[in-house]
UniProtKB/Swiss-Prot annotation:
NCBIfam families: pth. Belongs to the PTH family. The gene is Ptrh1. It comes from Mus musculus (Mouse). Peptidyl-tRNA hydrolase that cleaves nascent chains-tRNAs that are not stably fixed in the P-site of 60S ribosome-nascent chain complexes. Acts downstream of the ribosome-associated quality control (RQC) pathway to release non-ubiquitinated nascent chains from 60S and 80S ribosome-nascent chain complexes. Does not act on ubiquitinated nascent chains, which are cleaved by ANKZF1 for degradation. This is Probable peptidyl-tRNA hydrolase. One of its GO terms (molecular function) is peptidyl-tRNA hydrolase activity.
Length: 204
């Protein structure tokens, strides 16, 4: 991981002539491969798809890893917080401030207990539905307007098993579903951003 304060500072302060979007993969920093951090895994796949997998830069101002990626005439600010899930919103809100973005221009990618593994959904704002990372983002941005890509991880049968489930790693059987799921999630998100980049911001 490269760390470049000068690069990060220059990029964040430069105006971009086209549309710019922030895409945040929510998760627990230092816990890759867990179900709760699947949003960060999707961000990794997006970075690979757009050819910027080697461009992640640690930005101390927002306590996150950032990568800028072109998408047609638009630009994506990819963000993976270097914080625990329940304070991810601090990184997202700080990055939004640095890049001059509104809540409607921020996509959150996160795990979803109430969808089985392999299922995806695009949710256009709304409540956190019990997700601590989303709740943190809503609180720090003072808005619930952020579009969200929900990545199903399934809910365990017993309520007492939820914490161990989300903090646990995917089983070998689940791992087989992850590769195509990462591609599907990337397609869904990028297609939605492309469509919005061509029209008015309100066209969710």
């Amino acid at each position: 991981m490269r760390r470049s304060w000068a690069l990060s500072r220059q990029v964040s302060e430069a105006r971009f002539p086209g549309k710019r979007w922030l895409v945040a993969g929510l998760g627990n920093h230092g816990m890759p491969g867990t179900r709760h951090s699947v949003g960060m895994a999707v961000l990794g796949q997006i970075a690979r798809r757009l050819g910027v997998a080697e461009n992640w830069t640690r930005d101390s101002r927002c306590a996150a890893d950032l990568a800028l990626a072109p998408l047609g005439d638009a630009q994506l600010v990819l963000l993976r917080p270097r914080r625990l899930m329940n304070v991810n919103g601090r990184s997202v809100a700080r990055a939004a401030e640095l890049f001059g973005l509104t809540a409607e221009e921020i996509y959150l990618v996160h795990d979803e207990l109430d969808k089985p593994l392999g299922k995806l959904a695009l949710k256009l704002g709304g409540s956190a539905r019990g997700h601590n990372g989303v709740r943190s983002c809503i609180s720090c941005l003072n808005s619930n307007a952020m579009p969200r890509l929900l990545v199903g991880i399934g809910r365990p049968t017993h309520p007492n098993m939820v914490e161990n489930h989300v903090l646990g790693c995917f089983s070998p059987e689940e791992q087989e579903l992850l590769s195509p799921l990462m591609d599907q999630a990337t397609d869904l998100l990028l297609d939605h951003i492309r469509a919005r980049s061509q029209g008015p911001l309100s066209g969710l």
